[in-house]
Amino acid sequence: MCGLNAIYAYHPSAPPVDRGELLRVRDRMRARGPDGEGAWYSPDGRVGLGHRRLAIIDISERGAQPMVSADGKLAISFNGEIYNYRQLRADLERQGRTFNTDSDTEVLLHLYATKGMAMLADLRGMFAFALWDGERRRLLLARDPFGIKPLYYADDGRSFRVASQVKALLCGPVDTSPEPAGEVGFLLWGSVPEPWTMVRGIRALSAGHWLAVDASGAAAPVAWCDIGGVLSAAANAPSTLARGEAIHCVAAAIQDSVRAHLVADVPVGAFLSAGIDSAMIADIIAAPGLRPYTLTLGFAEYAGTANDEAPLAEELARRLDAWHSTLIVRRQDFEDEREKLLAAMDQPSIDGVNTWFVARAAARMGMKAVLSGLGGDELFASYPSFHQVPRLVRYGRRLRHPKPLGRWLRRVAALLSPPLPPKAAGLLEYSESIGSAYLLRRCLYAPWELPALLGEDFARAGLERLATPSALARTIAGNDHARLQVSALEMTWYMRNQLLRDSDWASMAQSLEIRLPLVDIDLLRRCAPVFAAHPDIRKAELAASAAPRISPQILHRPKTGFSIPVREWLRPPASGPGRGLRDWARFIHQRQWNAA
């Protein structure tokens, strides 16, 4: 886990790489890699790669980056982990390839030399990289299928710039004028949807895409793995396993993914809550003779309530004989940390506060890598959206023209005193399709509220550039399976743009790597056909098979989610925002968000 950056002066009129700029951008990401720093420049000075290192695999100096191939033709700056790198290395060695390190980075260089970008299909892990192919004179970028690791770029028509963070790129000469799609997207969703950012000059490389830049400039990004497509394929080819066999199949896949995510040359701990997902992970890593390091986050406001996860988590930790710690966070902690948190936030978001505090605690305990249960709700259909969204569409289909009728009713509802809550007012209008129902379920501010916040013209421009309805429809194209449709939407929109991004910036600000066994492409491909055939399989059934030491109290505990007492924290006399997530979002936005 690291921070990377690159500059490619591809146009003949562009000046050579400004080495000072490359190092400034690199060192803006110091927290992502406190263990080392490096830079590489092509002999002609037209290409530069930078790297900040958090040493997890092959922690020796041999694993330092940027890394150059033995023949000098390839150079790479890589952020992430390749969990199957040992198997890939063994295959390459059988082909006669020789290695100078024990790192997964060197495996990427050899894989590219043998297969080109087709190598991406072989990778199991979380990754973003910039690779210079000196022979073909092209810079290649790529991201993992889910978008666990971020990658941003800026292209001014002469030079192409890359970095792991938006704020790092802004240390260089990029267009910082406001991007309507970014601002509208933030208030619409509570996070900025890919590929947009808050500034016009910077874009995200979308998850599951790669991009090539040569002397003629940047080509269009190429989709090499589409999560919506994986789920669509499963919907059209469901498993033939009987229900009992299917449960055991998924349980085995979960165990395999958790164990794969333990590959490291440093200890790997785990976040532990009273939820099934993290409990499963902790149970699986607590093998005989091994005591896992576990950490629970609690909140003073939740003590003694149904949202207090600490007692059940501590009970499971004792059962697993784990080295366990519980951190209790109070409102004053939030007040004390708020400005640091906002400074670290790479793009505006209403989330990430919980990860900030638990990651800070893990780092202070000396951990470098931890496992998290993030992604389980999207995979195992645990959110209310999995029944609410299809139900709304079923109701809408009973009417002949729900959208125009709903739009009329919404306008009438606005005249009531008091007016209906926005989502209630939009129920009929947004019941036309799974995509529109999902938007209503997940939106922070409804689309018709945005002009009052941003101005009519700016809001309209942002909505047009986002083209959200068509983008949502593409996510579930070819998929008519209700459970897998909602999984595709949750994974591609909420999880990718909010949970994964917030998990990255909030943990990397503490120099901590978070690994996600339930956000794994191999696991998804094994599980999705099973859920297509047996959509009624419950998470508790899977956990009982995969992790038998979990108590019935955890297995059957009502879902609360990894939540924070945001209403209590944002209620006066706390300075700054008002109460609730919408006020928190407006507070962030009204600070005239400065990505620098």
Predicted regions and their residues:
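Active-site adenylate/phosphate-handling loop in enzymes that bind or generate adenylated species
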Residues: P145, G157, F357-L420, S503-L523
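Short low-complexity, flexible loop/linker segments enriched in glycine and/or proline
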Residues: E339-A343, S385-Q388, W569-R571
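Cysteine-centered catalytic environments shared across enzyme families
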Residues: M1-D346, T355, A547-P558, L581-A596
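Donor nucleotide-sugar recognition loop
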Residues: Q347-D351, D536
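Soluble or luminal CAZymes and related metallo-dependent hydrolases
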Residues: V250, I350-N354, S487, M491, ...
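Conserved S/T- and glycine-rich ATP-binding loop of Class I adenylate-forming
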Residues: L272, G373, M495
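Adenosyl-5′-phosphate
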Residues: M1-L4, Y10, L23-R24, P43, ...
